[in-house]
Amino acid sequence: MVYQCMIKSSSRTLAIALLVSAGLPVLSLAQAETDYEARLIEAKGEVTVFTADEPEGVPGGADMPLLPGDKVKTGEDGSAEIALSGEHGISLRPRSELTLSNLRRADSELSLALGSLLAKVQSLAGGLFRVRTPSAVAAVRGTEFGVEIDEADPEQTLVGVFDEGKVTVSGADGAEETLKSNQETVVRRGSRPMPAYQLRRLARHRSAMRGFRKRAGLMRKEWRAMTPEQRQAKRREMLPKLKLLRQQRLQKAQELREKARDKKPVRAPRADQQKMERRKQAIRDRLRGKGN
């Protein structure tokens, strides 16, 4: 028994040493037990993941392990779904930007810089789950909720609760407003949250939330946890492939631009230009006639 434990310990030490030599961050066992395991479950359309190793970003890939500090950005047609240890789910909507600031179970935090997200958070026993925007902080212990930075007015954040549960919303001065089922609030930068009112502006996300609820349930059922070594190995395997894919896409886009430029049609003279040319020609003809 002791011999088997020694073998396991040696194998784990060797795996960590290989990761360190490759220049990759290593998750300790203690960290793995106290942190959520974040994973990009689905990426549709334009989704880019920015990491410490790839600051220019790589295309988002399904089942890609994510680490604290990673940023996920969606384009005009993009959407992404992120799982935290198979317990909680985040749906990132188009034109959004989310950073996994902190994945500690006791006090996790996501930072939304642009756009909107929907979240399905299971009941937390003593832990706290927060979403921070430039103007507000939404703290939950288990519920279905949405957060949106107003596209027309980025200084304003909307927070709403869809299902049963509570979300505590605070502004810059620390003043709090608690939302219950079917309620929302608005927070302007530097101001306190408005008193809770009936879900209105975020109500348009209700059908999307219902669909995500089903996928989150399936995600929990199919979730297979990975060890820190497996996550690092998976990430090390995926990043070079995704980087190559980004380069191929950039090259293809450049070729398409050049092709479109080469095929740019010669603009035909407008009718008024043609009329002016005829008049000029008539004048030239008359002048030549007088000269003769």
Regions found by a protein language model. Name each.
Residues 52, 77, 85-87, 95, ...:
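Surface loops and adjacent helix of pleckstrin homology
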Residues 66-72, 99-103, 147-151, 184-195:
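Short, surface-exposed linear segments at secondary-structure transitions and domain or protein termini
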Residues 1, 48-52, 148-150:
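Short regulatory "switch" loops immediately downstream of catalytic or recognition motifs
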Residues 45, 66, 72-138, 160-169:
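Short, small-residue-rich packing micro-motifs
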Residues 2-15, 19, 25-35, 56-61, ...:
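C-terminal interaction modules
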Residues 32, 55, 92-96, 139-151:
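Conserved short histidine dyad/triad with adjacent acidic residue
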Residues 29-73, 79-83:
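N-terminal domain-start segments of secreted/luminal proteins
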